[in-house]
A protein has these predicted regions:
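Conserved P-loop NTPase
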Residues: 2-10, 121-122, 126, 130-131, ...
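Substrate-engagement module of ASCE P-loop NTPases
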Residues: 124-125, 147-180
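Flexible beta-alpha connector loops of hexameric P-loop NTPases
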Residues: 6-9, 102-118, 144-155, 183-186
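Amphipathic alpha-helical transducer elements in NTP-driven molecular machines
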Residues: 12-16, 20, 29, 44, ...
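Conserved inter-motif catalytic segment of the P-loop NTP-binding fold
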Residues: 59-143
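Phosphate-binding/switch region of NTP-binding enzymes
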Residues: 170-227
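The Walker A/P-loop phosphate-binding site
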Residues: 1-83
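Helix C-cap/helix->beta junction micro-motif
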Residues: 57, 131, 167-169
Length: 227
């Protein structure tokens, strides 16, 4: 957002058609953004394209998958014209299985307590810091948060993780799964706290018009920029 003094905040150009125009140049660097939508609306594709466009510019990117194994994810994404497996082979896009990370940390319990959350945050931020990640996607934050004991712990987890990632200069997309019923009453997350903690909210969905199903993308919230 441009101030009276002419200040313009640096942007992370998403490279996604139409989105950068809406955001006046991209997502403000270091933001944590919720990408919310119901099943099949393109959330995972949005997140992967966000990483690919960064990798094309030589950025180190990371994808933490909690909903499907990384092998299956990569097999599915090969169909898209924008994706090139060479980016994975060269280490520009790094894909991590959350289940493997849980096992490595010894987090075998059904639900996570405060100590578990701190261990998980440290593991994620250590990976970001070691690789020099500037773009990160967690898909989905909903699946991850189902393992956290309480709403307050979810809030603490997301706030602390977002703050640390921002300090490291990492722009983050948190994929949020919502039902069509919730999307109709302006709820962009499953737990009701994710949207308050996030710097931005991008909503994906579809709507029927004259017998045709149309896809839409809406920026509901984005701190630091007009939209």
């Amino acid at each position: 957002m441009e101030s009276a003094a002419g200040y313009v905040r640096d942007r992370c150009v998403t490279g996604i058609h139409g989105l950068d125009e809406i955001l006046r140049g991209g997502i403000p660097y270091g933001s944590t953004v919720l990408a919310a939508g119901s099943c099949g609306c393109g959330k995972t594709t949005l997140g992967l394209e966000f990483l690919v466009r960064g990798a094309e510019n030589g950025e180190a990117c990371a994808h933490f998958t909690a909903t499907e194994p990384s092998v299956k994810l990569l097999d599915n994404v090969r169909q898209y014209d924008f994706f090139d497996m060479k980016m994975v082979d060269k280490g520009l896009i790094n894909v991590f299985d959350m289940d493997v990370l849980y096992s490595w940390l010894g987090l075998t319990k059904a639900t996570f307590d405060l100590g578990d959350i701190h261990a998980l945050i440290k593991a994620i931020t250590d990976i970001v810091n070691t690789i020099g990640v500037t773009r990160l996607v967690i898909d989905s934050v909903t699946t991850l948060c189902y393992k956290i004991q309480s709403e307050q712990l979810i809030r603490d987890f997301l706030f602390t993780l977002g703050k640390k990632l921002s300090t490291l200069g990492c722009t983050t997309l948190l994929i949020s799964e919502i039902t069509s019923e919730k999307s109709g009453v302006n709820m962009w997350s499953s737990f009701g706290v994710e949207e308050a903690i996030s710097d931005g909210i991008i909503v994906l969905g579809d709507v029927e018009r004259m017998g045709h199903l149309l896809r839409f993308l809406q920026v509901v919230k984005m701190r630091g920029t007009s939209h």
